[in-house]
């Protein structure tokens, strides 16, 4: 399959991309009109060979014109990848897509990032954070609107039954994402305290009453076939950066001097290599591969949504 359809960070389409799409649409429109004109003239002149050639050209240009109109609505790379998969008949409108929408914290002190152990699954170290939670009657609304199904790849219990890990038919995916951004009753970026408290406060790693963080942007994969779960997937991760006070930064530096299996500090290079060090012979992956989405080196690849750059202060209550 085209490598462009594999899992990659997705950005809004640039102005240059949109200009190219517009020029393609105009070009195919002109070519189609010219072909129609030639067919009309040649039919009047009773020159069947000329009208036949123009008909062949029209058979190419008219579908291309329609495709170019469709392409204008593909404003992000994940939409482009979905369109390519449809046109290539890799997926249909009824193809089930697995979605996982999450938020992740960048907690950096000096040149190292604070990671916590994934105790439920891989046991690898990863950023503080997790999947968004549905609230109120949102899950019922999503069932009524888009016939969503529970994720069948990760076990569901009382703590995960309202997670934004779901399955949905491809034809509903765009409306689903639009609702997630605008109308959905769910956890919002102005209060992402829940996972912070569960993974750092309740475990006694830090003891803070309040935090401030900045919204860095959104990482969104292309629509791709996940080898691990053997299903087409769309993954979203909103990235926020902790803005520690002087006292909180001192607490983090103190943590760096202590050893614990609950957390780990890693440099950007260690995160990119997943903790593998060929020089020392440490070949086991210690760090989750999604962790790199949070490091500063990747911030330029994040989508700048409407919350980009905003800061939020939240109280931490256990």
Where are these regions (language model features)?
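N-terminal leader/linker segments that precede catalytic domains of diphosphate-processing enzymes
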Residues: 2-318
